[in-house]
Amino acid sequence: MTVDAAKPARRFSATTESGLALAIVVVLAVTALVDSNHSYWFRPQACATDIVRQTVMLGIFALGSAVVIISGGIDLSTGSMIAFSGTICATVMMVVDPAAMNTGQVGTATIVVAIAAALAVGLLVGSLHAWLITVVGLPAFVATLATLVGLRSLARAIVENVTAEFLGGRSTQIQIFDREFRYLGRTVWISAMLFILLAVLIGILMRYTVVGRHLYALGGNEQAARLSGIHTDRLKWLAYCLSAACASLAGVLAIGEQSVADPQTLGRGYELNAIAAAVVGGCSLQGGVGTVPGTVLGCLFLRAVIDGIAKIIKTGADVHEGWIVGIVVVMAVAFSQWRASGQRGKQFFTGALGSLAIVTLGLIAGTLVTLMADWRAGSATAAVTWVVLICAKIWENRVAVGQRAQGASGEATT
């Protein structure tokens, strides 16, 4: 990426970050006004602590995913890496001192060894990803999809065999009773400090070092970066190792917070949340664009939205988390692509495909509102959505006809 090209990119990132900051304020304000329990007013410290805890956990592994995305890759294995590293950490503690695992007195030395083992496994998995991509020649999507499936299955097998060996019976999870280790995962300020330190270090790496500039260049145009003398394979190795190491750290903190290593549920679906946070924060899935501050704000925005839904819906809010994240990601990517392309007059509902899209979007909107409220509200929402989108389609057609007429008159004049 040249200096001239970098300036518009920085302006674009700054605009994205400002918009995200404003969106976060709006989401928090709407939640405070709509929440019938007025949680933000009566329990501000507890609510803030909860949002910070969730944001920090998401942010730790989202930062690594953002580096991979900026470099032009993708890492789908983050959630499984969290489960695998957490399993390795708990397994090492059990193997080193099984008696202490049951009494809750593992000891600092054993904990340090277990955490080091989990981080080392992350670096090994990141190296495996880089090897599969750069040497074997697999697409990043395929390489990380394989480990997405494989790591979680391997973690489950490890837990069952270790518990059968040291506890006398097979189990699908490893319980952690050590107070010192649980304090590490449950104390918000420790996780927050680790997240801030990680964000600062990665931010310095990406913005102020040659390696960071080369990562942006790699994501912008890999062939041009290679021809200019940049060691692209080494950069991919760095990016995927960093992503896996961040996920490993998140896995260690997660089992400390939950007091259990359960590979069946730990980190499930987190890889999509990490990608969502990075994309919402301004990272382009095409590579070469994105910032650490934007990713941090993207994490905070996602968690604020999810927390707001939980406060407003009250019961069953976790059921709706997936589609909320999906809608936010689609809107963020579409808006980013629209701004980057500069096509202000783009038509979205042309032809039969546009008409089918209108029908589908109306049905989706109506279904979601029906699930959260009742069928009357859902029917009204679907009807309003159809009316609005049909009006948009008519407006697009009129604008297109006017543009064609202007073009024809201009040609006739010349």
Spans of model-derived segments:
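Cytosolic-side transmembrane-helix boundaries in multi-pass membrane proteins
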Residues: 1-29, 33, 227-234, 305-414
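Small-residue faces within membrane-embedded alpha-helices
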Residues: 21, 25-28, 55-58, 62, ...
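Single transmembrane alpha-helix segments in multi-pass membrane proteins
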Residues: 31-32, 44-101, 124, 131-138, ...
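Membrane-interface helix caps of multi-pass small-molecule transporters
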Residues: 67, 91, 96, 123-136, ...
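Alpha-helical transmembrane segments within multi-pass membrane transporters and channels
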Residues: 99-148, 297-302
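Helix-loop-helix "hairpin" substructures at the membrane interface of multi-pass membrane proteins
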Residues: 110-118, 125-129, 185-260, 385-414
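Transmembrane helix-bundle core of multi-pass membrane transporters
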Residues: 140-208, 258-267, 311-321, 334-352, ...
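Transmembrane alpha-helical segments in multi-pass inner-membrane proteins
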Residues: 247, 258, 262-329
